[in-house]
UniProtKB/Swiss-Prot annotation:
A GO molecular function held by the record: GTPase activator activity
BP-aspect Gene Ontology terms: microtubule cytoskeleton organization; post-chaperonin tubulin folding pathway; protein folding; tubulin complex assembly
Name recorded for this polypeptide: Chromosome instability protein 1
Further comment: Present with 704 molecules/cell in log phase SD medium.
Role this protein plays: Required for microtubule stability. Interacts with CIN4.
Source organism per UniProt: Saccharomyces cerevisiae (strain ATCC 204508 / S288c)
Length: 1014
């Protein structure tokens, strides 16, 4: 409540003092009340007048702010906002003049200003005056804004009121286009509901037939209640019959919106008849209920769920209107609700019916809200409690759990006198977690067993327990199409219930006598027995039944294609799951192995399913207990990157074959499969891998170490990072991995520590740092400081160059890397700065190294199959790193820095046939020239390197220019920009002007070296 009060205070403050600073905060506070507008209604009579009273005296900016606040309040509580507006007719001229003088809106804020004034105008026109003198002007100014959809509703209200007050003779006086305008007619006819006598002479029979034609369409449904009332008073029975017939003909509409409109309009007609003709009302509602009961007699698959949905919505709307007789309420709750509360049907393996269950909850909620529940028998209320508890906790759809819980709250709040539940028990129910379905089953199954078990003899508890048991053992076990829920029910309801002291021998016998009528149902029963067997319930007897069902009743036909995608409720996938579970638990080592591998092939692509993770241990255990594995088939599946087979390599019973298979197939796998397999190695390292003969163990260890160098790139990006991450996790899980030969591992960890992937940085740091020097926030600066204490190495700078010279990066990542480096660099002594610069040049591959890497197939590691870091790509990272640090202000270097040697190295790089590298180097040349010029300020050779670079850039410009006949290419553009950059940075005007003139006159081919050198 304190939070609500604070929000209301915030809104009132924002409305009282409208300002840009508070504006968004006020709107956010208003929108917090979307789910419960009644709380906001309390302050609207004060807020709305405050907003509008000085509207016409405000600046345009403030008018827009006010209009936006008004619009947001209006969205939450439209009718209450309109009722709170000032109705003084003295405001009329101000509003009309504002709308008349208003230019066409150019922004949404402008439209909202118009909307506010049109809404205000529609309220003032309800005053008891005809406004004849304002009639034409009002229609004229309002019609200017008919092209803005948001303005249409208030404009229709304005026109309806004006026509109603001024065209008083006959309907034919209305403009012809308005006679078929449904939104306008809806507002217009609404005015006649309060003036039935006027309607009797205003509408002729012809007029009513015309309105009938307009209303009897999907667009005109909202007109039907008003037309029905006018026609009833007019005595036009043929129109009344046509309207009722229209409802009956359209109950099965495919449109959900149409079904809701039909139900809402039908309820309004019923409400009118309840007052005007009670006998007809009873007949109409009784027919609707009987028709619904009749619908539910058919099998679910043959029921028209659209018609059923509309019928349920109608019943709910009528119940909410508090006009449904108690005997009919009782019929609905006893004959309809028990059948619709779990309604579902399958359509092309998609389970439908949640809209039926939702409308069922709507009925229950409406009955309780209408206070009809006070007249219901305790037995009916107990039945409702049972259904709502089950649906709120265990329905597969979250939206149904929401609506069930809302109805359950109402029931417990309004009818507990009859239910007689303990207040502590109510608190436990209302505090239960039901949003996550598996967790809800896990926690709330136990809650129901505790609160409503047979030891609790209250009538409510007895009823809930009976319904809960029937739902668990009968409907959910054999009729539920949602196999995920069925499985959760077995895991968390049936097995614990049978195992607990609450069960009796008769209950277990009831379970043992279950029989299915299809392969899927037999699999469901078999799964229950397997879970009982797994939990040591009557093992010998259950084991016999499992074998009997499997051998006699599971006639599995493999019809599916391996690549087909299932959903969690696919019967065929569940059948496969149960058969595999049977093989696992019964220890069948002579199972149908060919069928098993087909199952593995089918299941492996289903990684997105919740059930997938349960397949993994089952398949692994079956493989581990098989005495004669088909290794040829295994190799085929591994080569096709079958994930489940890859995950199972470590579970193969033959140790020698397991090693042979791993070493031969690991390099052939995709990075994703390699990372999964390393994860499996992690789980088996201590119990299996570390116990292998030393040669095999060493090879496994070397593979993991080499995986730290996996930089495989695909269309999905750096997928090698998955392998690097998993290898680091394995090392972290087994501290003794790092004991011994650390010389080969630490340099790799040092490089990875500086790389851009946060998880790789964190894991590398944790492996390198001692427990006492752990850093909470792992930033670029903290990494630099940590490595400085440890001693910086070239491997570290290779990793840092990859981060700071990244081709793809976020602004924050790049800024952090470069800024942290510059701060670190400036903290060093001059000699350390020089050494660091030399290190950063040394790590750049030479042109010769790049050429050699292209000739030899050295990029793929034969041990792991991973791609080593691409030499050219790494070189580009290094060049970009140098460019960025100089671009960010690191211009003056140590005077002993070998600028000429650096230029020679970069010169050779830009000669290579690699466009991206060449362009990167050409972009760096001007930075190198500028840095050398400023660093060697006191040196006689200050200008030498700058001139060499300028000459080279000129050669590139001329060569490209000559080759393309004045068409600018990438290299030429970059080289030209570089020359301009040097001239501007060094402040030389003669050379700058010469280059500008050559560009303007297209005479770049004629420019001389003497024109551009310093």
């Amino acid at each position: 409540m304190n939070n609500i009060r604070a929000l209301l205070d915030s809104i009132q403050s924002g409305v009282q003092t409208v300002s840009p600073e508070k504006h968004q905060q006020t709107i956010a506070a208003i929108n917090k009340f979307q789910d419960d507008p009644a709380l906001l209604d309390t302050i609207l009579p004060r807020c709305v007048p405050l907003l509008t009273k000085s509207f016409f005296c405000m600046s345009q900016r403030d008018q827009k702010l006010v209009a936006e606040l008004f619009y947001n309040l209006d969205k939450i509580s439209h009718s209450k906002v309109l009722k709170s507006l000032d109705t003084s007719i003295f405001r009329l001229n101000e509003i009309l003049n504002y709308l008349q003088d208003r230019a066409s809106p150019s922004s949404f804020s402008d439209v909202l200003c118009v909307y506010l004034n049109l809404s205000w105008l529609s309220v003032i026109l309800l005053s008891p005056y005809a406004f004849k003198d304002k009639f034409n002007k009002t229609l004229q100014v309002s019609s200017r804004f008919e092209n803005y959809p948001i303005c249409i509703p208030p404009i229709n209200k304005i026109k309806a009121v004006l026509y109603f007050k001024n065209f008083t003779d006959a309907f034919d006086q209305l403009p012809e286009r308005e006679q078929a305008n449904v939104p306008f007619l809806n507002q217009f006819l609404k005015l006649f509901i309060q003036s039935s006598e006027k309607a009797n002479y205003y509408f002729s029979n012809e007029n009513l037939r015309h309105l009938q034609q307009v209303a009897l369409s999907n667009d005109g449904i909202k007109l039907l209640p008003k037309l029905f009332q006018i026609s009833f008073n007019h005595g036009s029975h043929d129109i009344l019959d046509a309207i009722v017939e229209f409802f009956h003909d359209h109950l099965s509409s495919n449109s959900t919106d149409t079904r809701f409109q039909l139900a809402h309009s039908f309820a309004k007609i019923a409400k009118f008849l309840h007052q005007a003709d009670p006998a007809s009302f009873i007949e109409l509602i009784d027919y609707t209920i009987e028709n619904t009961v009749s619908l539910l007699q058919a099998p679910c698959d043959s029921i028209d769920s659209n018609e059923l949905h509309t019928s349920l919505l109608i019943i709910a709307e009528v119940a909410l209107a508090k006009i449904l007789p108690i005997d009919l309420v009782d019929r609905v709750l006893t004959l309809i609700i028990p059948k619709t509360c779990h309604f579902q049907k399958s359509h092309f393996q998609i389970i439908k019916g949640h809209h039926i269950r939702d409308s069922t909850n709507f009925i229950i909620w409406s009955v309780i809200r209408s206070n009809r529940s006070n007249s219901l028998s305790p037995q009916v209320l107990q039945s409702l409690l049972s259904h709502l508890l089950i649906n709120a906790f265990f329905d597969p759809e979250l939206i149904i759990r929401y609506s069930s819980f809302a109805a359950l709250q109402e029931l417990l709040g309004r009818s507990n006198k009859s239910l007689a539940l303990n207040q502590n028990d109510i608190a436990l129910i209302l505090q239960a977690n039901w949003k996550d379905l598996p967790r809800s089953f896990e926690e709330n199954s136990g809650l129901i067993r505790r609160l409503f078990n047979p030891e609790n003899t209250s009538k409510s508890a007895v009823c809930v327990w009976k319904v809960f048991r029937d739902w668990s053992f009968n409907w959910n076990l054999l009729e539920n199409l949602h196999l995920t829920t069925m499985k959760l029910n077995i895991d968390y309801n049936l097995v614990p219930l049978i195992k607990s002291k609450l069960s009796s021998p008769a209950l277990l016998q009831e379970v043992l006598n279950k029989a299915g009528s299809s392969v899927t149902q037999n699999c469901q029963i078999l799964y229950l027995y397997l879970k009982l067997f797994e939990n040591d319930v009557n093992c010998p007897k259950i084991s016999e039944i499992c074998i009997d069902i499997y051998q006699k009743k599971i006639k599995f036909q493999l019809t599916t294609q391996a690549k087909r995608q299932f959903n969690d409720n696919s019967p065929e996938l569940f059948q496969i799951f149960v058969i595999l579970k049977y093989w696992q638990l019964t220890g069948q080592n002579d199972f149908n192995q060919e069928l098993f591998w087909k199952f593995v092939d089918i299941v492996s692509p289903q990684k997105k399913l919740n059930l997938y993770n349960e397949f993994i241990p089952i398949i692994q255990q079956i493989i581990s207990q098989c005495v004669s594995l088909n290794y040829t088939r295994i190799v085929q599946l591994i080569k096709s990157d079958n994930e489940l087979t890859c995950r199972s390599i470590c579970h193969m019973p033959d140790q020698e074959k397991m090693c042979s298979l791993f070493f031969s197939q690991f390099p052939l796998l995709s990075p994703q499969s390699r990372s999964l397999l390393i994860g499996e190695l992690d789980h088996h390292w201590d119990v299996r891998i570390s116990l292998l003969p030393s040669n095999s163990y060493r090879k496994f260890r070397n593979i993991i170490i080499n995986c730290l160098d996996d930089y495989t790139i695909t269309q999905q990006g750096d997928v090698g990072r998955l392998v690097r991450i998993q290898a680091l996790k394995l090392m972290q899980s087994h501290p003794d991995f790092l004991s011994g030969d650390c010389d080969s591992i630490n340099p790799k960890l040092t490089r990875l520590l500086a790389e851009p992937v946060p998880e790789i940085r964190k894991l590398s740091y944790q492996l390198l740092a001692s427990a006492t020097s752990q850093i909470t926030v792992l930033s670029d600066s903290s990494i630099l400081n940590f490595r400085h204490k440890q001693g910086l190495s070239e491997e570290f700078w290779k990793g840092y160059a990859v981060s700071a010279g990244a081709i793809h990066f976020t602004d924050s990542q790049l800024t952090s890397s470069i800024d942290s480096f510059i701060v670190y660099y400036r903290s060093l002594s001059p000699s350390q700065q020089l050494e660091l610069c030399h290190d950063l040049i040394r790590i750049i591959p030479s042109a010769k190294q790049i050429a050699e890497s292209r000739i030899r197939d050295r990029n793929k590691d034969p041990l792991t199959g991973g791609m080593r870091f691409d030499t050219i790509k790494f070189t580009i990272h290094c060049v970009k790193f140098w460019t960025r640090i100089m671009e960010s202000g690191l211009v003056v270097l140590h005077p002993n820095f070998n600028f000429q040697g650096v230029f020679a190295k970069f010169y050779n790089l830009h000669l290579l046939d690699c466009t991206t590298l060449r362009v990167s180097v050409i972009k760096f040349f001007p930075f190198l020239a500028i840095s050398c010029y400023h660093t060697m300020r006191e040196n006689a050779d200050q200008k030498n390197l700058s001139n060499i670079i300028l000459k080279r850039l000129l050669v590139l410009v001329k060569r490209e220019y000559a080759a393309t006949k004045s068409k600018f290419m990438t290299d030429q553009n970059v080289a030209l920009q570089g020359m301009f950059q040097i001239f501007l940075e060094l402040g030389v005007t003669r050379q700058l002007q010469a280059l500008q003139v050559a560009c303007q006159k297209h005479e770049l081919a004629n420019i001389l070296e003497s024109d551009i050198t310093l």
